[in-house]
Regions:
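A short beta-strand-loop structural module common to alpha/beta enzyme folds
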Residues: 29-45
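Short helix-loop-beta junction
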Residues: 20-32, 78-79, 123-128
Length: 161
């Protein structure tokens, strides 16, 4: 059975609402035979990543970057999960991967730097972006929760085949 790993940093009620919607979408009744594993970013391991067939990542935008918790996750799993480094030690490109991923980011004013920072690291993993990035600014309402639900459902449905 394919496994979808959801890794998130949800320190506020707004971000937790998005996370809950993503998880609910991944568990949609119309999607069968996909195991959904949810891990806070500080608890996710390389084994979780290696045992998954697809990924959903959630983070806040903090000072123009992803959350420290999600960065810690990447620092912890990067090499073991197949990440490529360049000669100067920065993330290199593996040329596109097979495992699908999606991303949601919540910020107050701007999410650009957070999205860019995640994509630069993920670009060096054997993963491929399988859905539009969900970028949410400010309050989280029904429209934002619906988009998060759709993101979760999209990745789970891709794995279900």
């Amino acid at each position: 059975m394919p496994r979808l790993l959801i890794v998130h940093h949800s320190p506020t009620t707004l971000v937790q609402a998005l996370t809950d919607a993503v998880v609910a979408g991944a568990h949609d009744d119309a999607i069968e035979d996909v195991e959904v594993v949810v891990r806070p970013a500080l608890e996710a391991s390389a084994a979780d990543v290696l045992n998954a067939d697809g990924y959903l990542l959630g983070t806040t935008a903090n000072f123009g970057y992803m959350s420290g918790a999600l960065k810690h996750f990447f620092d912890t799993i990067f090499l073991e999960a197949g990440g490529a480094l360049t000669d100067d030690g920065s993330a290199g490109s593996v040329g596109g991967g097979k495992r699908p991923y999606g991303l949601w980011v919540h910020g107050r004013y701007d999410t650009t730097g957070a999205v860019r920072s995640v994509q630069s690291i993920v670009g060096a993993l054997p993963w491929r972006q399988a859905a539009e990035v969900l970028e949410v600014l400010g309050d989280v309402g029904e429209q934002e929760r619906a988009a998060a639900y759709e993101l979760g459902g999209t990745l789970a449905a891709l794995l279900a085949g």
